[in-house]
Curated annotation (Swiss-Prot):
Gene: Usp19
Tissue specificity: Expressed in testis, heart, kidney and skeletal muscle. Low levels of expression are detectable in all other tissues screened.
PANTHER family: UBIQUITIN CARBOXYL-TERMINAL HYDROLASE, UBIQUITIN CARBOXYL-TERMINAL HYDROLASE 19
Catalytic class of the enzyme: hydrolase
Induction: By streptozotocin and fasting in skeletal muscle.
Protein name, entry field: Ubiquitin carboxyl-terminal hydrolase 19
Localization per record: Endoplasmic reticulum membrane
EC number(s) per entry: 3.4.19.12
Gene Ontology biological-process entries: ERAD pathway; negative regulation of proteasomal protein catabolic process; negative regulation of skeletal muscle tissue development; positive regulation of cell cycle process; protein deubiquitination; protein K48-linked deubiquitination; protein stabilization; regulation of cellular response to hypoxia
Length: 1357
């Protein structure tokens, strides 16, 4: 450049003066570098390389170029090799001074280049092609000019020497005399210098070939010829002005301070092209403001032919700013808006310069607050801030404008895609990570890796086609301006070290992100990973295990992971949705997901995501415990609102069936739901169920279809094991004892009947369940009756009955009870006066109804009758039973066979030998037998007392209303009158009664004769005296003895029952001894482990409970449109449409009331493979069954007061849910370990994640979403700006997370009630307060759950 500047541009001075100035600056530079402690660059003798010292060989593939340099025979230290890459060229400098570089044939991806060492003294350069599948005919472009060649800068391509690269002479830029002062100033405000300073050197345009230059000292002043022999000129007419905009300017370079020898200056120099020799200066070309209302012109006035010494003493300099307060957001898919907050900026001297990869803001300001931040600067100081952009822009379409408080810059994207941030991320140079500073780099330099992010093949192809017609305008737009900035020879100020975020690591290739396999493998080899991808844990921030388990489970949802990994979600962010977070939640979740799958952290801290969630849901503020399912529902709902494709939600109404087909109503309801809710979350997680309501009064049926995000399936309540004794229809089969598990609450008899039905292979309609108390039927259960009051100690009998459909006629069902004819209970004292029996002559008289008490006389009996009246009833023996006989075959013989067959299992009967002289009672009246009542004989009662005639106190019973449901013996309303003769006067007056006589020798045959279709002859049945009598008890509780009518069927109604009375009276001939015994039965082998399985359920049982009809509670009453009133209707939920990812919540937590809260820890057995839901889904009849495979489980340990969450998950393959790309792992906060699949099913499972087989989620094309992104309003712009800042902050903080192990294990103090040990905003006082409050809450809950129920129960007793 010239030594002076004018109002229109820089001008050249006399050749002699400039040469002297150049030598003076060289001397000053050497002195300064010696003071800075870098004598190597000054004192090391220069070694002139020859062309044979570097041997070049190169090869190419479809997506990259590999260059090999033979630099010697010894080992190479990669840290001493200086390498600089741009998209078009490169420079490699060796420690001994040799260098190689040039302009490539085509563009490369400078951000992905690598420098590696190989055996044999080889240096290998890996250069990814920017346009894959493009074949390079040569490595380097053929130079256009024929300038002097730099010794040693010669290359060979495939063994053949290439033409040398053209160079240009240059000269050392001058330094200002205030260098020391500027260096001190730079410590407070960043880098200071001009276009030729070490921190801001001229660089090539992204479209211009670069030529290396290096000349001897004193050679190449600015008066020397240019590349085409033209001297610089000052342009006067408009035609030459346009040409001047197309020219490139090259400042002279010194060999010791040029790009080739500086580690900080990694950019290449641009080629200067001048137009006309008519003038010795060149006018700068500026980019005008695109705003027609605010068209600012930057004017520079510099004296023509000014003294160079005066320039050196210039008081002001251009200050390169490292940071300016700003924010940015993406306005739609095509533009980015940047707000730079600088007040009182001077419009006449401020402007913005745009290039396709960056922009530079040059301004002056009068703001005192801003100037105080930069000591030594004033209103005339020129500030410069440059931003390297993340992707390419259209410089011609970018605009800017000035306001009183800020500068607004609008960038037009070249490609319509989301950037995810403003500045370009970090990159690598020479195989090592290099962080690109967030501060500016010079406009005329291109730092390595500062180019746009690598594009996919399709995007790159579109970018190449779009770049071709604009090559001329882009090449000539800014490059001429870069070299003509004022004060470019001012002394540079060193830039302080800036703490920059580390670059993000490359993630494994996603299905929707075609990345080169070779480059990915090389990146994985170079990357220093601390764990395998997918084995990164999450730090427990303090009781945040509920959040960690949910995030880890969702991160293993294959479709969701890929959707956020390849950044497809960016095109669907809805900034206008007031129900969302403006994209902040989606971006935060995406960054967290990427960190979990990079493998660069042992544990990651999800504090940013928690803060975003807490800003939207205040219940998650702080570090209290929460429900994992509640957090999961909020997170998925928040992601849905952030990604909702609907910008303006229309009003919709609930769709009712009104008699229409379910298929039509369901589809209409789903489409209406999609009119307001359409996102990737809906496509992946949401299903649809059918809700059916039935009014109990008018039978109005209402059917609606509603969406669901997860299925909250209830668990059966705590189980109880009930012993059930099953009696087959025929008595020859021994009873079988079954153990059946039912719920302690809300259980019904139908559960038992269905369970037994599956065991005995009998229809539930043919079974009857009855409860037995004190050897009599207490009640017979209908299928709908509740079993809540039944305890495991109660006796339950189940009987198989003959169905009328099978018999094809009326079937008579009879209840049968057993009792002895005469009880054998000794009596020692009077029940009324408590006087003991004195002698045999004064025996106590028994009560003839119950035979359980005795009296001295009738007076004592009448006195005691009020107390004895309620207890006066006979007691049965054995077990009662039910018999079912067809009406046409109900003969006395058949009935006797059935009764004796059933009775022998519960009573012991023994007939003693016949004793001559025993009194026969056949001649007595029937009243002696029909009115006798006995008490039950205790099993094992050896003390027996002979019954004398005087002890038989008989009375005539008077019927009384039966107060019991199954009362077999009515109490008398008046007391019996004792008689010393043993026979009352009423019986004597009654005379002979019918039915008393019995046939001699009558005996019942064996029960085996009761087989259907087999009938014994009457002679065989009547061969012996019967052991019992049969009495019929009618509805009025009156008894009548049945008579044997031969083959004539007995006439018995359905409202009567039977009593089997054993002949145990010792005064009768052939009496029997009878006593109760334990029921003879066989044990069911399948019930052996029922007690152990009492706390085990299956997922099918839970789904059955979910789909079972239930009656609404009064507070949930449904408004019937037909009755016009709220009704406690019957509600039933049925699955209609199943999602691709099914989430099932096991409702382990029971909230019956504020006091009664409980957690069910019983095991729920759920399938890991092949969950078939075809029997639960009534809609969408498809060819393939809805089969699901488990891929994640959230576990909860502990109870209601405190607990801990963990997760088990695997990453299913993208093609088949049965296979896994990453196997099962256990996520316990920051600890991640592998587990076997058999260890996944535990009693602590809380939330289950299933993936459907053979049902991929189709993503809509990105172009289809263009209509969902109209121009954003002010509120949406603010949300987009904040979301963009969060994306940058999260990416920056992603690499600064502590990698050590997290908190304590699963039972550590952080997972229980208490404050976090290291909360970011929690002080020691706050921790103590949280601990005290948590302890008090735990004590209150303990009192309410334990002591209050005890007090309340004792009160009601």
């Amino acid at each position: 450049m010239s030594a002076g500047t004018s109002a229109t541009g820089p001008r050249r001075g006399p050749p002699g003066l400039e040469e002297a100035t150049s030598k003076k600056k060289q001397k000053d530079r050497a002195n300064q570098e010696s003071k800075d402690g870098d004598p190597r660059r000054v004192s090391m003798p220069r070694k002139e390389p020859t062309k044979d010292e570097l041997l070049l060989d190169w090869r190419q593939s479809s997506d990259k170029v590999v260059v090999k340099l033979r630099v010697g025979t010894g080992p190479i230290c990669l840290e001493e090799v200086d390498a600089a890459f741009t998209d078009t060229d490169c420079v490699v400098r060796l420690p001994d001074g040799r260098q190689w570089g040039g302009v490539f044939f085509a563009k490369i991806q400078s951000s992905c280049t690598k420098v590696q060492t190989r055996k044999g003294g080889l240096l290998q350069l890996a250069l990814p092609k920017k346009v894959p599948l493009l074949t390079w005919p040569s490595l380097l472009k053929k130079p256009l000019g024929t300038q002097e060649l730099v010794p040693g800068l010669r290359c060979q391509e495939n063994g053949q020497e290439l033409s040398p690269i053209a160079l240009e002479p240059g000269s050392e830029p001058r330094r200002a005399k205030q260098e020391a002062r500027n260096q001190k100033r730079a410590q407070g405000r960043g880098e200071v210098g001009s276009g030729a300073s070490p921190g801001a050197q001229a660089g090539p345009s992204a479209k211009r070939a670069v030529h290396l230059c290096r000349g001897p000292e004193g050679e190449g002043s600015m008066d020397g010829p240019g590349p085409q022999g033209d001297a610089p000129s000052f342009l006067s007419d408009s035609a030459t002005q346009v040409e001047a905009e197309e020219q490139l300017h090259v400042p002279p370079v010194n060999p010791q301070t040029s790009l080739l020898g500086s580690e900080k200056n990694l950019a290449l120099l641009t080629v200067e092209k001048t137009v006309s020799p008519r003038s010795d200066s060149v006018s700068p070309v500026m980019i005008r403001n695109r705003d027609p209302e605010k068209d600012d012109h930057f004017k520079e006035e510099m004296a023509v032919g000014a003294d160079p010494a005066a320039l050196a003493d210039e008081p002001e300099s251009m200050v390169n700013l490292a940071f300016v307060k700003n924010d940015s957001y993406e306005k739609g898919p095509d533009s980015v808006v940047v707000h730079v907050y600088v007040k009182e900026s001077r419009r006449d001297t401020s402007r913005v310069l745009f290039r396709e990869q960056d922009f530079t803001l040059i301004f002056q300001t009068r703001d005192g607050n801003f100037l105080r931040l930069h000591p030594g600067c004033g209103p005339h100081t020129i500030f410069r801030w440059q931003v390297k952009l993340r992707n390419l822009i259209e410089p011609e379409q970018c605009t800017f404008c000035f306001t009183a408080s800020r500068i607004d810059i609008c960038l037009r994207k070249r490609q319509s895609q989301r950037w995810g941030g403003l500045e370009a991320p970090a990159t690598r140079v020479g195989g090592a990570k290099v962080a690109v500073p967030t501060g500016p780099t010079p406009l005329d330099s291109t730092p390595p890796g500062g180019g746009p992010l690598p594009l996919t093949g399709q995007e790159e192809a579109r970018a190449v086609e779009k770049e071709k017609p604009k090559a001329r305008s882009e090449d000539s737009g800014l490059d001429g301006v870069v070299a003509r900035t004022p004060l470019e020879h001012v002394t540079p100020k060193p830039e302080p070290h800036l703490a920059s975020p580390k670059p993000t690591c490359m993630v494994p290739p996603m299905p929707h992100s075609p990345v080169s396999g070779d480059s990915v493998e090389e990146d994985e080899e170079e990357e220093k990973k601390v764990c395998l991808p997918g084995f990164t844990g999450l730090v427990n921030l303090g009781n945040t295990c509920f959040m960690n388990s949910v995030i880890q489970s969702l991160s293993n949802t294959r479709e969701l992971r890929d959707f956020f990994h390849d950044r497809s979600f960016e095109a669907e962010i809805n900034y206008n949705n007031p129900l969302g977070t403006g994209g902040r939640l989606a971006i935060g979740f995406a960054v967290l997901l990427r960190a979990l799958w990079k493998g660069t952290h042992q544990a990651f801290q999800p504090s940013k995501l928690k803060a975003i969630v807490a800003s939207k849901a205040s219940q998650f503020t702080g570090y209290a415990q929460h429900d994992a399912q509640e957090f999961m529902a909020f997170l998925l709902d928040g992601l849905h609102e952030d990604l909702n494709r609907i910008q303006n939600k229309p009003y919709t109404e609930t769709v009712d069936s009104d008699g229409r087909p379910d298929e039509v109503v369901a589809e209409e309801a789903w489409q209406r739901h999609k009119m307001r809710n359409d996102s990737f979350i809906v496509d992946l997680f949401q299903g649809q169920y059918k809700s059916k309501l039935v009014c109990p009064v008018c039978a109005k049926v209402s059917i609606t279809f509603d969406p669901f995000l997860y299925l909250p399936v209830p668990l059966p309540q705590k189980q109880k094991v009930l012993p059930i004794y099953y009696f087959a229809r025929e008595p020859h089969s021994k009873p079988i004892k079954f153990l059946v598990s039912v719920s302690k609450e809300n259980s019904s008899a139908s559960e038992v009947l269905e369970s037994l039905s599956q065991s005995v292979h009998v229809k539930p309609e043919s079974l009857r369940l009855a409860e037995v108390i004190k050897n009599r039927f207490h009640r017979v259960f209908l299928p709908s009756h509740s079993l809540d009051a039944v305890s495991p100690t109660d006796v339950l009998l189940c009987f198989e009955l003959l169905s009328p459909e099978l018999a094809k006629e009326r079937v008579v069902v009879l209840e049968v009870q057993q009792r002895p004819q005469v009880p054998s209970i000794p009596i020692s004292k009077c029940a009324a006066c408590q006087r003991k029996q004195q002698s045999e002559d004064e025996k106590l008289k028994r009560c003839t109804r119950c035979y359980r008490v005795g009296y001295c006389n009738q007076f004592c009996q009448k006195t005691h009758w009020p107390d004895h009246k309620g207890l006066c009833r006979p007691e049965n023996i054995g077990y009662p039973f039910l018999v079912s006989v067809p009406a046409s075959r109900l003969t006395y013989a058949r009935l006797a066979q059935l009764l004796e067959g059933y009775a022998r299992y519960s009573v012991s009967v023994f007939q003693p030998p016949f004793q001559p002289g025993r009194m026969a009672l056949e001649s007595q009246s029937p009243g002696c037998t029909t009115l006798l009542s006995t008490s039950s004989l205790e099993a094992g009662d050896s003390e027996r007392e002979p019954i004398q005639p005087s002890e038989l106190q008989l009375v005539t019973p008077v019927a009384e209303g039966d107060t019991g449901a199954h009362r077999m013996w009515p109490p008398a309303d008046r007391g019996p009158v004792p008689s010393t003769s043993g026979i009352s006067s009423e019986m004597l007056a009654s005379g002979p009664m019918e039915g008393c006589s019995l046939l001699a020798g009558e005996r019942v045959s064996r029960p085996e004769a009761a087989v259907p279709g087999y009938q014994h002859s009457r002679e065989s049945v009547s061969a012996h005296t019967p052991q019992f009598f049969i009495y019929k008890i009618d509805a009025s509780s009156r008894e009548q003895r049945l008579e044997d009518k031969g083959d004539t069927p007995l006439e018995l109604g359905d409202d009567c029952s039977l009593a089997l009375v054993w002949r145990n009276n010792e005064r009768l001939q052939e009496f029997v001894l009878v006593a109760s015994k334990e029921l003879e039965c066989a044990e069911d082998p399948g019930s052996a482990g029922e007690a152990a399985r009492a706390g085990h359920f299956t997922l099918d049982q839970c789904l059955n409970l979910f789909t079972r009809p239930e009656v609404l509670a009064p507070e949930e009453a449904w408004y019937c449109p037909q009755c016009k009133q709220h009704r406690e209707a019957s509600k039933q939920l049925l699955l209609w449409r199943l999602p691709n990812v099914l989430i099932v919540q096991l409702k382990r937590f029971s909230f019956r009331s504020f006091i009664w809260r409980d957690k069910i820890n019983d095991l729920v057995e759920f399938p890991v493979r092949n969950l078939d839901l075809s029997k639960f889904c009534i809609g969408q009849k498809e060819e393939q069954l809805p089969s699901y495979d488990l891929y994640a489980v959230i576990n909860h340990y502990g109870g209601m007061i405190g607990g801990h969450y963990t997760a088990c998950a695997r990453l299913p393959s993208d093609r088949s849910s049965q296979r896994s790309d990453v196997g099962w792992r256990l996520f316990d906060d920051s600890t991640v370990t592998t587990v076997d699949e058999s260890q996944v099913v535990t009693r602590y499972a809380y939330v289950l994640f299933y993936r459907r087989r053979n049902s991929p989620v189709e993503r809509p094309p990105r172009a289809a979403h263009a209509e969902h992104h109209p121009d954003l309003g002010p509120a949406a712009e603010a949300a987009a700006s904040q979301a963009s800042r969060i994306w940058q902050e999260l990416e920056a903080e992603e690499e600064m997370v502590p990698e050590g192990p997290g908190p304590l294990g699963p039972w550590g103090p952080q997972d229980w009630v208490g404050p976090p040990p290291r909360g970011p905003t929690t002080s020691d006082e706050g921790c103590l307060r949280y601990f005290v409050l948590g302890t008090v809450a735990a004590l209150v809950a303990l009192v309410l759950n334990v002591f209050y129920p005890l007090v309340s129960q004792s009160r009601w007793r």
